[in-house]
Amino acid sequence: MKKFFALALALAMTLSLAACGGKSGSSSAAPAASAPAASGAASSAAEEPAELSGDLVLYSSMTEGDLDALITCFNEKYPDINVEVVNGSAGELTTRLAGEASNPVGDLVWGGMADSDGDRYADIFEKWVTQYNDEAISGYSTPNGLYSMDHLSTVVFCVNTELEAQLGLNIQSYQDLLDPKLKGQIVFSDPNSSSAAWNNVSNIMSVFGADSDEAWSYIEQLMPNLVIAGSSSACFKSVQQGEYVVGLTYEDGAVNLVKDGATNIRLQYPSEGTSATAFGCALVKNGPNPENAKAMIDFLCSAEGQTALAAYQEGTLRYTNANYEVPDNAWLTPSSEMKWVDRDVEYLTANKDAILEHWNDLWATAGNN
């Protein structure tokens, strides 16, 4: 398990307000999933005080680029709030929060909190959601009052084009991943601890049928080609570095490598179809700086905040507010040009533990762990 570390994210940089602005187009996001409706049990956020200052400890599984964008844009609106970041996987962060429950250090979590998590983290998060919850696109408002859903993570293959060509392959589909040439050449993360990996398992279930014999037959055939990495970011970084041919991953992580100049990888949405899970942020129960945390959650979920973030990132992340504007220079493929499959979020949430148990049983006998 990797160590936790604080990220230095250019807090001392002097940036103009234009740094988080930009020319924008129309709003664009994934089609609505089959998701449970908001329970309405959570209270909405109050208007934040005119002046906020002090500290804010953010636990996050997001990429360094995403965190840089958030802190830069957030500090333009709240320059007197000092943000400290602790980075780790969703599993690492929730385990740490549970251990700190009697004396919380963190104020909020961003990333890795998925709509499929249900109430499993009710002991560490406050039942509080953003005042912008009603502005979320259909199907992506809070599932239970614990999480404010701010962005979508879409399933994608990250393909090393040089290695693909050397093997004489043209990887387009899930069926293509079963090629014997890819034995030990597909990198994946552990769905027991990685929300990105669970997102990919969920998409396989959505393509082949949730918990169906066809889905499990496919997974069993795929496993000999898989290598499990210690972090979800390895599923695109190690592909770009030439260690693996394919990574089963999420689009914003992979597209940022392309944006940063990588020329030996491409993003391939499964030809059978892709889907997205909503990820969000959550207020830590009894955290030391709740008002600052609420201000950040509201910023993350507002059209203003999401438009600023999208412009700063050049459209490398899909957001949930129906009113946010996608920049004209967005790197992601427009949703209208992609094949989407429906995802039964309610079923996957209710049966997550059983699905993971079945996965673990198959992996234990796959002979490559």
Describe the predicted segments one by one.
Residues 21-24:
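Bacterial signal peptide processing site
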Residues 57-68, 90-91, 105-243:
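Extracytoplasmic ligand-binding site segments that recognize negatively charged/polar headgroups
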Residues 153, 181-192, 217-222, 228, 261-285, 299-323:
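Periplasmic-binding protein-like
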Residues 158-163, 205, 277-289, 299-300, ...:
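A bilobed periplasmic-binding-protein/Venus flytrap-type ligand-binding module shared by bacterial periplasmic
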